[in-house]
C-alpha cells in the first residue's frame, strides 16, 4: 500500500504572486523548505500528485503556453533533486462554473478512489487555501494548510514532513471498569516531565521513572477502588500503559525493538551470571531489564522483597504490574533485581525497564525489525 501526498501548486510548491498567475519565468520561486521536506517524505514511501486550480487556463487572459514554460521548469528542477510527481492534475475552469473537477470537488480523483493500492490512512493533502482543506475532507484524508501571508495557515513544510514521515507516536487510552477509571496519554517522540496521579504516591513516583528515564512524555491519571485495596488500580494502570505503548508504536517500523545492555556493560558484576539486559545500579541494588517488542507477551521475574509493602505499594504487585504491561503491549520482558533495600529494588526495576524501553523504541530508520514481515 502506497501513501499519496496530494499537493497544491501555487502558494504550496511555488510562491504565489499578487496576480495569482505564474505565467512568466521570473515569477517562479520555490516555497521555503519544500524540497528537503519532500525528499524526506519520498524516503518515507510517499508518492506525489499535484492538484491545482488554474482559473481560465487556456483562455486569452491566461494562455496555455504562458503556463507551460514555468510549470515545466518547476517540474525539471524538482526532478533534478530526486522528486518526481506521479501525475499533475489541473482544473482549468472558473470559480463560477462550479465544476466537480475543481477543488474542493474531487472529480479529478475518480481513478485514485478506485485504486486499491493506495494507503488512504496515511495519505494527505497540502495546500495554502481553505479549499485545499475542504478537498482533503472530501477525500477523508488529513489536510495541512501551509502558512502564508495571503491565507493564514498553521504549518510549514518541515513540520508537515515531521508529522507524516516521522509519524509522531502518540496514544491516549481510557480504560473504564466498575473498579477503576484509568487514562494514559503518551508521546514517544516528545520529552516532557511526567505527570502521574493514581492516589498512591509511591506508585506515582515509580510511574514517573518510566517517563523520565524512558525519555518520553507520559501522563497517567487513575481513580480506583482504593477503599478495597490497591490491586485493581495498579493492575489496570499496567494494562492501560501497555495498551498505550502498543498503540503508539503502531506497526513498529524503524524501532530498535530490543532493549538490552551490551556484553561489555560497565555495570556488570563479575561472577553474577543472573544479570542481563539493561543493568542499572542503585546504591547496593542492581536491576536489569531485557525486552523485546515481539508481539508475544511473556514475563520473567527474578527477585524477591522482604517487606510486604513499600510506601503504599504492596511488593507482591510489583511483578504483577510489569506482567500487566507485558500482557497489554505484547512485550517480552525479563526483569532481574538483587539488593538489600526494598525501596531501591522496586525503583531499580522501574528505572531498568525505562532505560530498556528508551533503547527499544528509538527509531533507526523505516525498516520493520523482523524477517516475518509483521510484529
Swiss-Prot record:
Gene3D superfamilies: HAD superfamily/HAD-like, Imidazole glycerol phosphate dehydratase, domain 1. It is found in: Cytoplasm. One of its GO terms (biological process) is L-histidine biosynthetic process. It comes from the Bacteria. SUPFAM superfamilies: HAD-like (SSF56784), Ribosomal protein S5 domain 2-like (SSF54211). PANTHER family: IMIDAZOLEGLYCEROL-PHOSPHATE DEHYDRATASE, IMIDAZOLEGLYCEROL-PHOSPHATE DEHYDRATASE HIS7. The gene is hisB. Pathway: Amino-acid biosynthesis; L-histidine biosynthesis; L-histidine from 5-phospho-alpha-D-ribose 1-diphosphate: step 6/9; Amino-acid biosynthesis; L-histidine biosynthesis; L-histidine from 5-phospho-alpha-D-ribose 1-diphosphate: step 8/9. Residues 169-375 are annotated as: Imidazoleglycerol-phosphate dehydratase. The active site is at residues 8, 10. Residues 1-168 are annotated as: Histidinol-phosphatase. InterPro entries: HAD-like_sf, HAD-SF_hydro_IIIA, HAD_sf, His_synth_bifunc_HisB, HisB_N, Histidinol-phos, IGPD_sf, ImidazoleglycerolP_deHydtase. This is Histidine biosynthesis bifunctional protein HisB. Its cofactor is Mg(2+). Its EC number is 3.1.3.15, 4.2.1.19. One of its GO terms (molecular function) is metal ion binding. Keywords: Amino-acid biosynthesis, Cytoplasm, Histidine biosynthesis, Hydrolase, Lyase, Magnesium, Metal-binding, Multifunctional enzyme. One of its GO terms (cellular component) is cytoplasm. It catalyses: D-erythro-1-(imidazol-4-yl)glycerol 3-phosphate = 3-(imidazol-4-yl)-2-oxopropyl phosphate + H2O; L-histidinol phosphate + H2O = L-histidinol + phosphate. Mg(2+) binds at residues 8, 10, 128.
